[in-house]
Amino acid sequence: MSQANSSNQIKNQSPNSPFSNFLADLKSLYPNFRFQPGPRFLFRPPNTIFYEPSNPNDTNNSFQDFALQLLHELGHAISGHRNFQLSIDRIKIETEAWHAAQIILENHPNLQTKYHLFFNQDFAEAHLDTYRRWLHQKTTCKKCGLTMFQDKNQTWYCPHCDLI
């Protein structure tokens, strides 16, 4: 990371920024979880939530986006997500985490008021779409184009090419 980007992130994470204040509020509300800066938003069981520090030059990373992604990772933590066995389970736990994020926000109306936050279903669906596309790519047979299925050993089979 360049020094300019680093100083911009620090400036945007200043003690009075909504990013820092929101993070402090979540730490206070959920003291059993550790919130750490990292290269991306990620929940690492059993209790660490990594967040991508905001960059004021990135217009795609608004405070609303930052807050929703952080609530999503907290949703994983509160839901007790550890890992997934089957690829279809990935979509299930991602959906559960977005639902948990919505519930967290509903249970803390003070966060909604203080930070002018609202749960953006379109934002959540856009993120879920990335997993849906990933699963579609993973399940499409490269030979014939049919949808494959995964067994309990995480092996993929095409109903046409592999089972005939």
What residue ranges belong to the model's regions?
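Long, well-structured alpha-helical subdomains associated
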Residues: 5-10, 58-64, 107-164
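Active-site scaffold of zinc-dependent metalloenzymes
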Residues: 9-16, 23-64, 77-81
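Anionic, Ser/Thr-rich low-complexity intrinsically disordered regions
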Residues: 11, 40-44, 85-92, 133
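Short alpha-helix boundary/capping segments
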Residues: 62, 66, 89-92
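Short alpha-helical catalytic segment bearing the HExxH-like zincin motif
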Residues: 65-74
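Catalytic Zn2+-binding segment of zinc metalloproteases
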Residues: 73-90
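TPR/TPR-like alpha-solenoid repeats
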Residues: 77-80, 104, 131
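Post-HExxH zinc-binding segment in Zn-dependent metallohydrolases
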Residues: 89-119
